[in-house]
Amino acid sequence: MVNTKSGLLLTLTLFGHANIVRYIPRPFQTVDEMNEELIKRWNKRVGKKDMVYHLGDFCFKSRYEDSRNSKWTFQDYLEQLNGTVILFEGNHDPPNVDGYPLWRDAVIQTKIGAVYCSHHPGIGVPMDIKKLFHGHAHLHGPVINIDRWNKTFVDVGVDHHDYYPISIDEISILIKQFKKYHKAKRDDTVLQV
């Protein structure tokens, strides 16, 4: 387990989304296999007392029937997962998730500074914030971008991180490696990894 004192960031699990296996593509044969593996990897990385910021697209539908005819609800997925989960609204999340609150966006204080968190990259970001975490992995874009205003965008989607949650410490290392590698290649557009 990694050091998770600053919380974990994760998105786009899309539990119950059969077609996401093909769209991304994900390395699973069935949606049941995907759901089970995502839960297993989450619980391997996240402790019972950890905080997880899930930046949208938690599940595809509020109800999912698996191959064993078990009906999974939004709450059923949450009950299988370690940690306290703060859910952000994504474009695939059902509008009413059994009264569970969904955040639109937030600025959180972390050991690497203030970070803007949202499902959608770069929308409504306060100008003084330089680090942005988003969970929109189905943009099929890079994991890290730095724009011409020197804002750092990090996609925390599971598809980019071997289907595990990613910690603040791991994100910090990624950003440092990215900046060091691309320091000489910088132009006024966007850097990508």
Question: What kind of feature is each model-predicted range?
Answer:
Residues 1-29, 162-193:
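Acidic, histidine-bearing metal-coordination/catalytic regions of metal-dependent phosphoesterases
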Residues 2, 10, 15-109:
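Core catalytic region of metal-dependent phosphoesterases/phosphodiesterases
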Residues 6, 62, 67-70, 118, ...:
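Generic serine detector
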Residues 8-10, 53, 86, 137-139, ...:
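Hydrophobic/aromatic beta-strand patches that form the interior of the parallel beta-sheet core
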Residues 97-191:
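Conserved beta-sheet core of the metallophosphoesterase superfamily
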